[in-house]
């Protein structure tokens, strides 16, 4: 029998032993990342409570501060606020450093009716100075006098009545007399109605 011819093969000629060489260019498919279907929840801050406040159109800075102060003290009725404002205007035109007679001076140089509501009697006049020493502030300043005013026993006696809504200016004026104890009514009532006409409302956030 004839000898079988030997066949020499190399690995290069054997099919399927190695993968084909890489092909340049883009792959035939793209890898898509998994889409996050969860919806992000945006935290919404709760709306701050609001309230209606009175402002005074065409009024001075001192008048604005006083109106804010009495509203903060719990007085909300228009007529009550107008009555208080009218009385302070009659007494001092909101000049906290006015001395009886009209001169502008410090508390220590007056010695008689002084300030927003012309504190005259010894106990009320010196009470203002004592209050300033005890709690801080100048006895000639608007802020100190407003704080003193609402801490006086004369005010405390009528405070709840002034906070009670729905009364006429004349009724609130009766309460104010026992608070201030004026000797001359003057233009208090007219000033009160003037303020009533100057009042307007605004909505503010409650802090």
Residue spans for each PLM region:
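Non-catalytic cell-wall polysaccharide-engagement segments
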Residues: 1-25, 31-44, 125-207
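Peptidoglycan-targeting cell-wall enzymes and recognition modules
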Residues: 45-65, 92-166
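Solvent-exposed, polar/charged alpha-helical surfaces in well-ordered, non-transmembrane soluble domains
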Residues: 64-68, 72, 82-85, 147, ...
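Extracytoplasmic/periplasm-facing segments of secreted or lipoprotein envelope proteins
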Residues: 74-76
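Short, functionally critical alpha-helical segments immediately adjacent to catalytic or ligand/cofactor-binding
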Residues: 79-95
């Amino acid at each position: 029998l004839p000898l079988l011819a030997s066949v020499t093969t190399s690995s290069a000629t054997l099919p399927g032993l190695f993968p084909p060489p890489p092909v340049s260019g883009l792959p035939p498919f793209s890898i898509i990342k998994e889409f996050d279907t969860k919806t992000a929840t945006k935290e919404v801050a709760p709306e701050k409570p609001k309230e209606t406040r009175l402002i005074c159109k065409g009024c001075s800075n001192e008048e604005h501060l006083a109106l804010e102060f009495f509203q903060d003290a719990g007085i909300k009725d228009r007529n009550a606020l107008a009555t208080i404002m009218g009385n302070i205007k009659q007494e001092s035109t909101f000049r906290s450093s006015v001395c009886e007679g009209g001169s502008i001076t410090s508390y220590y140089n007056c010695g008689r009716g002084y300030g927003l509501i012309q504190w005259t009697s010894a106990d009320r006049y010196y009470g203002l100075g004592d209050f300033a020493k005890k709690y801080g502030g100048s006895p000639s300043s608007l802020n100190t006098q407003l704080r003193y005013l609402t801490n006086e026993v004369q005010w405390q006696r009528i405070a709840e009545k002034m906070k009670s809504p729905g009364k006429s200016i004349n009724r609130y004026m009766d309460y104010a007399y026992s608070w201030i104890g004026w000797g001359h009514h003057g233009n208090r009532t007219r000033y009160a109605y003037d303020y009533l006409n100057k009042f307007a409302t605004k909505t503010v956030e409650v802090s």
